[in-house]
């Protein structure tokens, strides 16, 4: 159910290297407080009134109760969402992370205004049926289409958003849909990583029992100042 070896390599820093996880300093302080990192994105929020929301929060609570919870910063429940297509973020101003028609020095406000104009009238599928496939490394729930047809619809939606926004990333096709529950703040020892893997299995088992499938949508264009809040600008349904 979970790629344990990849998770251990990530949690210990062997996969990416560096003194600390990439989110520290860019998205969060060393203590887990959010820092300013404005941008826009296209997402599906998880309905707070849904059984799926309660199941995700319960899985997050299992992780919070672990002995290594302080190594993570956990997302507020009302920010839980699944990204359809990543937009722009202020600290990532490179040609492969920025709309091809915009100068790299364009402000986030200008980039967001451009995105809203390009997506006006863009109609996404209204609902997406997805299923959880794993809890990876104690911080993210891997998601996939509930069926092959649903997975194909998700991928076609990503492709359409890529083309509308003129934002072509080299890793576009390898993207794994997910719901982020937390961010890692420090590298772990292998023993600590193994403990997180076991806790992730426990959380995944409970999550799959409570939420074998969920429906998300409609898609939204959202803006953010930090990773704690994603404000809807518009639905992508007309």
Language-model regions, residue ranges each:
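Histidine-dependent nucleotide/RNA phosphoesterase domain, centered on the 2H-phosphoesterase fold
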Residues: 1-238
